């Protein structure tokens, strides 16, 4: 049990997702196996909540997204205003207002072949926006959680800067 638990919501089966500005039913939303995010974990992400019609701390999240992209020498290819506009468009398409978690993912884009060099890209960045209804698990909120320590630790800033929400989260998963 952890802090990321939420109550299942049947509306999520009908959620509309934005991929590069195209609105798709969740069952139709797909990203290429040649996407740098899939091949290499090459990209950045942010997640934030929609509460009573307001995107909580959205300016800070967008700023961190762009800072993370700049840190890994990735040009998002859109302005902050364009990204924010698309977030609102997908939320509006889903008629969402409250208890919503939004995941914004930006990868470096498509690669012509599985190759590590970040400059070998054949498309603009891939931008995915996934909004879902996620209300906190009331039992967990009431009962709290149990803290567990493990021997695997995350590396320091010289290994992977913890201030960047990088798609490559293996060090966090292992920890």
Q: Could you tell me what each predicted segment is?
A:
Residues 1-175:
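Conserved alpha/beta cores of soluble small-molecule-handling proteins
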């Amino acid at each position: 049990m952890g802090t990321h638990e939420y109550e299942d919501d049947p509306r999520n089966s009908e959620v509309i997702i934005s991929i590069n500005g195209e609105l798709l039913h969740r069952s139709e939303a797909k990203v290429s196996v040649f996407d740098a995010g899939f091949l290499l974990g090459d990209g950045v992400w942010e997640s934030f909540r929609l509460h009573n019609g307001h995107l909580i701390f959205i300016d800070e999240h967008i700023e961190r997204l762009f800072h993370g992209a700049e840190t890994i020498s990735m040009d998002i290819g859109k302005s902050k205003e364009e990204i924010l506009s698309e977030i609102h468009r997908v939320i509006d398409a889903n008629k969402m207002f409250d208890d919503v978690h939004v995941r914004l993912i930006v990868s470096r884009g498509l690669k012509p072949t599985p190759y590590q060099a970040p400059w070998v890209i054949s498309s603009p960045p891939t931008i995915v926006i996934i909004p879902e209804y996620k209300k906190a698990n009331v039992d967990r909120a009431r009962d709290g959680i149990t803290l567990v320590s493990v021997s695997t630790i995350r590396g320091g800033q010289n290994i992977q800067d913890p201030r960047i929400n990088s798609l490559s989260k293996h060090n966090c998963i292992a920890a």
